[in-house]
Curated annotation (Swiss-Prot):
Lineage: Bacteria, Pseudomonadati, Pseudomonadota, Gammaproteobacteria, Alteromonadales
Source organism, top-level taxon: Bacteria
Modifications made to the protein after synthesis: Is synthesized initially as an inactive proenzyme. Formation of the active enzyme involves a self-maturation process in which the active site pyruvoyl group is generated from an internal serine residue via an autocatalytic post-translational modification. Two non-identical subunits are generated from the proenzyme in this reaction, and the pyruvate is formed at the N-terminus of the alpha chain, which is derived from the carboxyl end of the proenzyme.
Residues modified as Pyruvic acid (Ser): S252
Protein name: Phosphatidylserine decarboxylase proenzyme
List of catalytic residues: D89, H146, S252
The reaction(s) this protein catalyses: a 1,2-diacyl-sn-glycero-3-phospho-L-serine + H(+) = a 1,2-diacyl-sn-glycero-3-phosphoethanolamine + CO2
Length: 287
């Protein structure tokens, strides 16, 4: 059965399906939208008591519901300068050292940081022998992405690609999954060195947004687009620890990369399959 599911993903028109779902998710359809939201809440057992707007009728589009804000204080920030925090609600897919430029995906599967970062060689070199973490956001999760540490944006890269599902089954069976799906790479300069936040698209993920650029929608095609940002002066973009940096419309995966010797150790509960909550301790940083 698993092989059939994977084979179907190779065959299905993933981009077309994602575009159609995206249009529906952005449409204001009144009672139809409300009914869809209620079904989704029941199907995925979503705890709406955490949402700033808990009533399904409060959302005019499915996208508004999916990117819903949480009540203030519902995700307290672990306020210890020696720790960086989880950027999202989700589950750890994998985490650990980057071996040279190789990142562990699942048993029998690795991929390179060079491929993940859109073949930006200078960027990839900064993360050789560093550390990584891959966090999967399930449909039930809160889908805004926050900063694990204060950082100044230096570069954004849009990498076109496929739109495979990014659930655990696909991660175990599709080689180089996170380096072949469509993605947005945000490179930050931090007190512990460079940090990459890679927002990976997936089937029916209508779009990826950042707080500085809005929805990232370059022209269709195979071209990689890059944007450089000043790290000094009046136009600098600096986000504090815990600030929102982006969001998914219909969920996916975040891959974080850190430079060699930036992290001392992961928090004790940061292990594969562990549930994450935004703002909780993720890793201790080097002194």
């Amino acid at each position: 059965m698993d092989k059939i599911k994977i084979a179907l993903q190779y065959m299905m028109p993933k981009h077309l399906i994602s575009r159609l779902v995206g249009k529906l998710a952005a449409a204001e359809l009144g009672s139809i939208t409300t009914a869809a939201i209620k079904w989704f809440i029941k199907q995925y057992k979503i705890d709406m008591s955490e949402a700033a707007q808990s009533e399904p009728e409060a959302y005019t589009t499915f996208n508004n519901f999916f990117t819903r804000a949480l009540k203030p204080g519902i995700r307290p920030l672990f306020d210890d300068k020696d720790y960086i925090v989880h950027p999202v609600d989700g589950a750890i897919s994998q985490c650990g050292p980057i071996k040279g430029d190789q990142i562990f995906q699942a048993k029998g599967h690795e991929y390179s940081s060079l491929a993940l970062l859109g073949n930006q060689a200078d960027d990839a070199k900064r993360f050789e022998d560093g550390d990584f973490a891959t966090i999967y956001l399930a449909p039930k999760d809160y889908h805004r992405i926050h900063m694990p540490i204060k950082g100044t944006l230096s570069k954004m890269t849009y990498v076109p690609g496929d739109l495979f599902s990014v659930n655990p089954l696909t991660a175990e069976n599709v080689p180089g999954l996170f380096a072949r799906n469509e993605r947005v790479v945000a490179l930050f300069e931090t007190e512990i060195g460079p940090m990459a936040m890679v927002l990976v698209g997936a089937t029916i993920v209508a779009s990826i947004e950042t707080v500085w650029a809005g929805t990232v929608t370059p022209p269709a095609g195979k071209k990689v687009f890059t944007w450089d940002y000043p790290t000094e002066g009046p136009d600098v973009i600096t986000l504090d620890k815990g600030d929102e940096m982006g969001r998914f419309k219909l969920g996916s995966t975040v891959v974080m990369l850190f430079a060699k010797d930036a992290l001392d150790e992961f928090a004790k509960d940061v292990v594969p399959k562990a549930v994450t909550r935004m703002g909780q301790p993720f890793a201790k940083i080097e002194d």
